[in-house]
């Protein structure tokens, strides 16, 4: 699990206290979703070439995608593809916490390559949703020289997005 591994590494630098909150718990106006784990995901053409590969970018899979192992033509796959038409090599970020679905986020050029593919496409998402899982949260209190307190809140749950994630911790 990438989040827990990140926290383990950060614990080497900062004395973090880790707390677990069970999936399904209501926190104010939010419900903690099931714990999601992904091991691999790809779209291969009929020749066996991986056109889209989770191992090249973890943004390629819609976060919280359900597991799938399918053979589809492009027309059937199209509703599960997300791209930004005006941006050739940009991979969009999508998630589906509360709606059971699956999908891939692809560059425009990958989309066009899939569209040109002849024959069936092989779609695999090796993932799991665990209703009995949990969300790990870290906290740390750094004593200051006055009685004033400041709360700094940050997160890193959206993969590979430096502008709004791990950069906030650093």
Where are these regions (language model features)?
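N-terminal hydrophobic/helix-forming segments and targeting peptides
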Residues: 1-170
């Amino acid at each position: 699990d990438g989040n827990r591994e990140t926290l383990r590494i950060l614990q080497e630098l900062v004395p973090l206290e880790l707390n677990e909150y069970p999936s399904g718990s209501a926190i104010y106006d939010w419900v903690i979703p099931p714990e999601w784990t992904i091991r691999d995901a790809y779209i291969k053409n009929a020749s066996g070439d991986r056109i889209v590969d989770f191992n090249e970018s973890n943004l390629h899979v819609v976060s919280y995608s359900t597991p799938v192992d399918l053979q589809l033509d492009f027309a059937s796959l199209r509703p599960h593809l997300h791209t930004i038409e005006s941006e050739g090599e940009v991979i969009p970020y999508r998630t589906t916490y509360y709606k059971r679905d699956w999908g891939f986020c692809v560059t425009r050029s990958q989309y066009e390559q899939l569209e040109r593919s002849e024959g069936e496409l092989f779609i695999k998402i090796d993932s799991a949703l665990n209703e009995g899982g949990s969300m790990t949260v870290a906290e740390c209190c750094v004593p200051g020289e006055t009685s004033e307190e400041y709360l700094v809140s940050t997160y890193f749950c959206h993969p590979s997005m430096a502008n709004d994630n791990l950069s906030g911790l650093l």
